[in-house]
């Protein structure tokens, strides 16, 4: 059993699991209910697929192989750091974290529940790109979120349509800070391991693991690639294929304005 069953309670009954919202390689996300405040929440659980297993009777998570215990503990600490980073961010376009705790041999954090879907899910469902007006609205909102993130000296490092949620009112939210890194006081970055990235959304410094070249521009590149994908419903070009100030690597629909084309090309400068 990889996920908690409906009606499972956490923190002495404070939270109740309602259903699974999503599953990934490092965790499960649930729709939950805060019984104290009588409100729906999202609950993220650290669970390493292929490394951990769950007792069906007690719901306790354990490591399948003793050789993976250290890896599990290190990744669980990163999971908790992700929650703490999110907790510090105060912007209406970033999901708020309200609680962090350990239980069942693993860790959980509780967030606002967004009644919506990711931009990637929405495009997959409709089979159509977003209109330029819709993209401009989304871009404006995510830039607000990134301003807060970067002022806190955090780089998101995994910005893409799958990591932006949109609700039924058109409000956009930047989510999933699992790959994010924070700059220490001495200017170094909080990582000693190789970083994963999504092809098409990563600039050259990220592909080449050149940590000393990371900065706000790394996220701006990914946001430009996201805008391109939303406008075209096509995979963005790889950074290595983009020439400076040239549109040759891009395939915009004729409906996209010249100003928007220039903006995307500028954001995705190699």
Question: Where are the model-predicted features located?
Answer:
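Conserved activation segment of eukaryotic-like protein kinases, specifically the C-terminal portion
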Residues: 190-206
């Amino acid at each position: 059993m990889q996920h908690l069953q409906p009606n499972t309670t956490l923190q002495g009954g404070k939270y109740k699991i309602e259903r699974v919202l999503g599953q990934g390689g490092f965790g499960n996300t649930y729709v939950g209910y805060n019984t104290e405040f009588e409100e729906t929440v999202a609950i993220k659980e650290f669970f390493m697929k292929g490394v951990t297993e769950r007792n069906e009777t007690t719901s306790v998570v354990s490591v399948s192989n003793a050789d993976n215990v250290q890896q599990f503990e290190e990744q669980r600490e990163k999971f908790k750091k992700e929650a703490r980073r999110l907790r510090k961010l105060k912007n209406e376009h970033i999901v708020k974290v309200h609680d962090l705790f350990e239980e069942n041999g693993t860790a959980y954090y509780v967030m606002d529940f967004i009644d919506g879907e990711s931009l990637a899910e929405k495009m997959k469902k409709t089979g159509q790109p977003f209109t330029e007006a819709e993209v401009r609205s989304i871009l404006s909102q995510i830039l607000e979120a990134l301003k807060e993130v970067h002022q806190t000296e955090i780089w998101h490092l995994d910005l893409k349509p799958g990591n932006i949620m949109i609700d039924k009112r058109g409000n956009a939210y930047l989510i999933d800070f699992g790959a994010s890194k924070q700059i220490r006081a001495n200017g170094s970055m909080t990582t000693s391991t190789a970083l994963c990235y999504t092809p098409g959304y990563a600039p050259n410094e990220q592909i080449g693991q050149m940590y000393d070249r990371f900065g706000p521009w790394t996220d701006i590149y990914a946001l430009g690639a996201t805008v391109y994908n939303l406008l075209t419903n096509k995979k963005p070009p790889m950074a290595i294929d983009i020439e400076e100030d040239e549109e040759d690597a891009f395939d915009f629909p004729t409906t996209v304005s010249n100003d928007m084309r220039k903006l995307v090309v500028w954001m995705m400068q190699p």
